[in-house]
Amino acid sequence: MEHFNPILGKETAGQKFITCGEIMLRLTPPNYEKLRMASNFEASYGGSEANIALALANLGVDSTFFSVVPNNSLGKSAVRWLRSNDVHCTPMILTEPNETPSNRLGTYYLETGYGIRPSKVIYDRKHSAITEYDFSQVDLDALLEGFDWLHLSGITPALAPNCRGLIIDMLKVAKKKGLTVSFDGNFRSTLWTWDEARDFCTECLPYVDVLLGIEPYHLWKDENDHSKGDWKDGVPLQPSYEQQDEIFQHFIERYPNLKCIARHVRYAHSGSENSLKAFMWYDGHTFESKLFTFNILDRVGGGDAFASGLIYAMLHNYRAMDMINFAVASSAIKHTIHGDANITDDVSSIRNLMNMNYDIKR
């Protein structure tokens, strides 16, 4: 397979990937219990950017994760978990109690849905170590040296002002150094407002090559008169090909730096059965994936698995239709894996699903 990607304009073989975000302790009541019923919790680790680094590392991509965690048993355990999945953690910052006003690991509680009952997430991540750290101490030029691909999301800047500054600075440095940049808006209503998210994420767009999702961004019909609305206003969550193609075209007209835009579409039949498909703009065309239907063991991290699948396929220069189908198949498989991350080192299992091959492998 050729590894020069003419759209990205670079050799993709052996590329080094880095991402930045908060890794959290995840606490889940067992056996689909509601939080109010729980007397014990299953503990694991997760977070959008960490999930993507871990998924790519399991598929053989050289992946590094940058974050700030407390220098205590919880922080060290999170780092060990990443390293056990082949994620490089050399740039990770472990803070001492006297280094930041707060020295704690962010936490979230997951109440896993079942049937008609949806899942529920409660965050406890205010004043975590990453939100209190002074990132002016970090030499971002040195941090990104030697890497080829940077992935960021709209979750980390929602945490605190210092994180917003970090993300913008990383985007600028990455652009200057010629890294491929992917960005997922990943709006979290419990972390900031819709308007805050739209303002910030739109500011990021000029630095992005690969855009995941079409929200939360401003795409005004008239920059001087916002009363005329956003091009995305009124577009359904489950758009037709024509509706999605039109939105992609408006993005490309406004931001010609974008080389790929992809978004997945979910059809929720119940809390335990969903279908997924995706649309992607790439090389001047809009592509629509197959529709995948599956039962859900753990929905958390499905979007991250979609992102990691797309990045993997781009790094391996898949054809466009294979690229988007591989991304959706990666997300579908994640829904069958317990925990935040798509922990599979078997590319063939994703490709088999992509090609709708369910035979038992003997």
Question: Language model features by range: what are they?
Answer:
Residues 2-92, 113-116, 133-135, 290, ...:
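Glycine-rich phosphate/adenosyl-contacting loop at the front of the ribokinase-like
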Residues 23, 185, 305:
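Active-site metal-binding loops of divalent metal-dependent hydrolases
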Residues 66-154, 181, 350-362:
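Conserved N-terminal subdomain of the carbohydrate kinase-like
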Residues 166-178, 200-207:
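Catalytic-core regions built around general acid/base machinery
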Residues 173-180, 255-259:
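A short helix->loop->beta-strand "cap" motif at the edges of active sites that frequently abuts
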Residues 191-283:
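Conserved phosphate/ATP/ADP-binding segment of small-molecule kinases
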Residues 290-356, 360:
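Conserved post-catalytic alpha-helical subdomain immediately downstream of the catalytic base
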